[in-house]
Amino acid sequence: MVVSAGPWSSEKAEMNILEINEKLRPQLAENKQQFRNLKERCFLTQLAGFLANRQKKYKYEECKDLIKFMLRNERQFKEEKLAEQLKQAEELRQYKVLVHSQERELTQLREKLREGRDASRSLNEHLQALLTPDEPDKSQGQDLQEQLAEGCRLAQQLVQKLSPENDEDEDEDVQVEEDEKVLESSAPREVQKAEESKVPEDSLEECAITCSNSHGPCDSIQPHKNIKITFEEDKVNSTVVVDRKSSHDECQDALNILPVPGPTSSATNVSMVVSAGPLSSEKAEMNILEINEKLRPQLAEKKQQFRSLKEKCFVTQLAGFLAKQQNKYKYEECKDLIKSMLRNELQFKEEKLAEQLKQAEELRQYKVLVHSQERELTQLREKLREGRDASRSLNEHLQALLTPDEPDKSQGQDLQEQLAEGCRLAQHLVQKLSPENDEDEDEDVQVEEDEKVLESSSPREMQKAEESKVPEDSLEECAITCSNSHGPCDSNQPHKNIKITFEEDKVNSSLVVDRESSHDECQDALNILPVPGPTSSATNVSMVVSAGPLSSEKAEMNILEINEKLRPQLAEKKQQFRSLKEKCFVTQVACFLAKQQNKYKYEECKDLLKSMLRNELQFKEEKLAEQLKQAEELRQYKVLVHSQERELTQLREKLREGRDASRSLNEHLQALLTPDEPDKSQGQDLQEQLAEGCRLAQHLVQKLSPENDNDDDEDVQVEVAEKVQKSSSPREMQKAEEKEVPEDSLEECAITCSNSHGPYDSNQPHRKTKITFEEDKVDSTLIGSSSHVEWEDAVHIIPENESDDEEEEEKGPVSPRNLQESEEEEVPQESWDEGYSTLSIPPERLASYQSYSSTFHSLEEQQVCMAVDIGRHRWDQVKKEDQEATGPRLSRELLAEKEPEVLQDSLDRCYSTPSVYLGLTDSCQPYRSAFYVLEQQRVGLAVDMDEIEKYQEVEEDQDPSCPRLSRELLAEKEPEVLQDSLDRCYSTPSGYLELPDLGQPYRSAVYSLEEQYLGLALDVDRIKKDQEEEEDQGPPCPRLSRELLEVVEPEVLQDSLDRCYSTPSSCLEQPDSCQPYRSSFYALEEKHVGFSLDVGEIEKKGKGKKRRGRRSKKKRRRGRKEGEEDQNPPCPRLSRELLAEKEPEVLQDSLDRWYSTPSVYLGLTDPCQPYRSAFYVLEQQRVGLAVDMDEIEKYQEVEEDQDPSCPRLSRELLAEKEPEVLQDSLDRCYSTPSGYLELPDLGQPYRSAVYSLEEQYLGLALDVDRIKKDQEEEEDQGPPCPRLSRELLEVVEPEVLQDSLDRCYSTPSSCLEQPDSCQPYRSSFYALEEKHVGFSLDVGEIEKKGKGKKRRGRRSKKKRRRGRKEGEEDQNPPCPRLNSVLMEVEEPEVLQDSLDRCYSTPSMYFELPDSFQHYRSVFYSFEEQHITFALDMDNSFFTLTVTSLHLVFQMGVIFPQ
């Protein structure tokens, strides 16, 4: 056996254990040099001490610490360096042993392959001899029997070659028994019967071809199992590897501990004993503990060196003392010492670089070895593939023999041709298993054999072939000659279409050697270890690595490139040496100057020493980095060696399985030789035997196939099995069952092989099964443990749809139908109809009541969809007279973040009741979100109330109705159009009554929508016949519809904002020391806010008119007085949308007829701090305010008897953009003042009495529509409620802001009776600090004012005054319709096409009690949320009074004071 792929085999394995010891000797020399270096440094320390002594400036104590520190670091560095070198040397030694073992295994496998190929060639020649035509009279009888016996012997020989050595004894016994059976079966009569039954020679050919293929190029990928392949002629002498220089006794111990294969070998000169790895089987006894035992003496040696260094340090101290005492130091002597030290340092550096070059050479050699092994593996894989193809072809040929043909053609010439074809397939198999350099000879042999086959095609020649006697000796000689003519290396063709890789064996392809060497040294390395060339011969195999990371294009970096990379490092080391030499000369100069001029100072020397230490540290760091690179390369080679070892194990398993298949085929051939009955030796028996041969051939093909091709092989096997079953008739199957032969082993083989993908004899594991064997496990010390990333499962808790079925106290019944509907809803509804919502009225709070969060629901950091739906209450108002607010239905959904195309098509008829907080006690702690606290959420709330019929009759004696609340959290999307028209919107005030002194500030009494995108739409619709009942009842309940719209880019903003009214916000009776608050109605700080209030056409309702006609004024007044005592202010309808933030192209073309009232501050007491923006505080904002009043017909008649009228106000915060047109037409806009009355003492500031929309993009649209005949009631009520349209326009820079601002009036903002020490507050109506705010109030076209005018004419001025005074005492300000839109953060081109006829009423604050803590978001606290709120108020008209005494009278029991 000749190993041609490794550097340690044959002539290329000169480097034995002695050479390894020679390599380790420089390390010993290095250690000695280190000792000398330390000794010389000690003398240098003595020199420094003597110089300091001469100049009388040396302080030994200071230098002592520095010297000790330097010595300690040097010692630690040396110890670490030696330990690292020991580890690297140990790893290199282990890998050497491993490479030797793998190379030995490869050699053995090559030898097995060669022997199997020779056996298959012999069998092929024997079959050809059977085809040779001989004399006809000798074609039968004993000769055929002997030839068959010879074929069996050749098959046995093939099995023997594929068997391990430890099984030879058993095989010999089996062979003796089989030979005896063959000889007993040699009777002429039985041989003649066998000839008459047409013994299938194709089956013999199948046996030969299959067996010759079964031992092909390392057959299996299965792991090696209990098979140890060793040959007597391959036994190798073992020597030892000694890693460190030690005494003779230590070397002897190492020889006893760790035997290593030597370089010499008999017969084939192979140097590998280990079959499955150096750390496996009985030869892997040296584990980690033994390695530690070997390293312990080295540790002891290092400790001894440390003790010696410590002693030398003390000697240095003694020398310094002596030099100080005796003054015997001479500089000339020191000069020689320094030169000697430099010379030794240079020598040390050179030796160190040489050692590094040697290590790099070793790494290069290992790289070459890995390349060679990888090439060998590639060739074996190619052989395996070719053998598999040849066996598959033979299988198909045998199946063709089984195909039923015409009976007259199944004999004679056809059989002869089929046998010839089988011989050709067998020759092809032998050719595939032969090396390339023998292909020419094989081709000549094939040509001759083909000619012989063609010549032997006649029946006469066939008879002659049967009569011929082929000499067995010549066959044996041929087999021996062929076995010797072929080398172990088969082919240098790359692997074709089959890439066997494992994920755990993937290796990084960038293996770079970082050591440096000169060109000459690298050339010497090339001469020492030549790389195998590209040509293949009997002993030299070309290596083209095609299946590994270092093969083909990835292996371009050869030795010259490595040398080029190492040269810069060599130059760098030389430069470092020069720098050290220069520093040493600097030290000499400093010493000379100190001696001659008496100017030596320790401080200067101290800096020099520190600099030297710093450079030394840098050098150590660079050296450690270089060692880390070497360790990384070793790790990569570890992985590569392991992968190759695994593949070798799998190839061994394939070899074992092929041997088993060949043994089965041998048994089948013996069964053919068994004498049977003469009548059963033909026909069905031959057919069954051929089928059995086909199955064995299929099994052999399966064994030679890789695991990843099992699926294809299964399909082929199923088809073959079907053909075989179809080719046998039932009669033949019955005969097969009656036959006594084949033997049990053959039956077992047939059953096993008939399974398409089952394991054979439990030796082939399942295709998807991970198989490990203890014999093949590799030592874990050579494998770097891989870190596995642990992935934790993210648990997403999604709240389910919940429905609150509990009814609170003092709440009325709920419709069961609507409750069922709200519970069953899973998606956002397009229309939320008939929604009722009741207010949250907290009872009296005790003192020091702690704060709570989210009384009803606290949905923090959630995307919540809340839908509260109360169904159509048509006749339930009659029953509401003596009961509190009804309990709403609550349906809560957490909707997914999606992009719906349509959000809410229609939010109609939505009612909402106010949130009233009564009689809160002192020191009440703040709480947040009395109804809902939805912090950091995107929340959509829609409150929809619809079709309350006959509502006006029972509104006198009942509490505020419970509106339906439908709330949705809408997905973030980009709708194209937002709201084309927001019509008929009313808004009512939020009244805060009798809050005690010291009330802490709170935020967002109704809504605190901080840092949110808010859209509030208050829509009041279809107010029919409400003018007559407004005298006798409190403010009606508006409809509430609220939507959270997408963050989108609507194209339309507001084409026309028409007819908008706005009323003031009044704060009454605030006591002294009232702290400042912000945004009494809306606090929209740092937000983009859009508010639009639109009041529109109020149509006539005949039924309501008739009812008013039926009732007299006296009855209405009496009903109003009775109703005001028993009810709370009703909830208006509110429709609110959040609009997107966009850049509108057209904003407002013309701002016409703009009226604005002044802001008046009345009666502010002393020490009252300033406040900002009583009506609007728009600090640091670009604000456009348009107040438009138009077509006030006969308005002067009623101005005498009423409070100052509320003009129409249109206000806009223009976006930061350059729009082409701002507002097309803002017509007839009124605005009323904001009054603050009698705030109690020490009232703490609060923020956003109605809405606190801080840091939000807000759009509020209040739309009041179709108010007809409202002029008649203006005489008996307070200042009328103007129409208010407010928008927050985009952050844009308009080119044209206001084309025409005509007829603009401004009314005052009245702050009444503010007590002393009242702290400043901000934005009584709106506090829009640091925001871009657009507010537009548009009042338009009040139709049919003539009838109202006539009614005023019928009443005298005195009656109107008396009615107004009585009305002011008996009623609360009514709730107008409010339609509010929260605009999205986007760039809309046009926002609202038409906002018509919008009214808004003020927000009143009454009698806050003492020590009242601030709270946030009385009704809703939606912090950091995208919220849309829509309130729609229906059937109401609002009148404002600023009288707190009447409110105390009206709330009787609740406000006793």
UniProtKB/Swiss-Prot annotation:
Extra information: Encoded by one of the numerous copies of NBPF genes clustered in the p36, p12 and q21 region of the chromosome 1.
Positions with biased composition (Acidic residues): 165-181, 436-452, 801-810, 821-833
Localization in the cell: Cytoplasm
Native source organism of the sequence: Homo sapiens (Human)
Domain Olduvai, chain residue ranges per copy: 165-259, 436-530, 707-799, 800-871, 872-963, 966-1021, 1022-1114, 1115-1207, 1210-1265, 1266-1358, 1359-1457
Protein name in the entry: NBPF family member NBPF12
Entry similarity comment: Belongs to the NBPF family.
GO CC annotations on file: cytoplasm
Basic residues bias (residue ranges): 1102-1120, 1346-1364
Chain positions covered by the region annotation Disordered: 162-200, 432-472, 721-746, 791-838, 1100-1139, 1344-1378
Extent of Basic and acidic residues compositional bias: 190-200, 461-472
Keywords, in A-Z order: Coiled coil, Cytoplasm, Repeat
Gene (name only): NBPF12
Tissue: Widely expressed with highest levels in brain, ovary, mammary gland, skin and adipose tissue. Also expressed in testis. Detected in a number of tumors including osteosarcoma, mammary carcinoma and hepatocellular carcinoma.
Main location: cytoplasm
Ranges in coiled-coil conformation: 75-119, 339-390, 610-661
Source species taxonomy: Eukaryota, Metazoa, Chordata, Craniata, Vertebrata
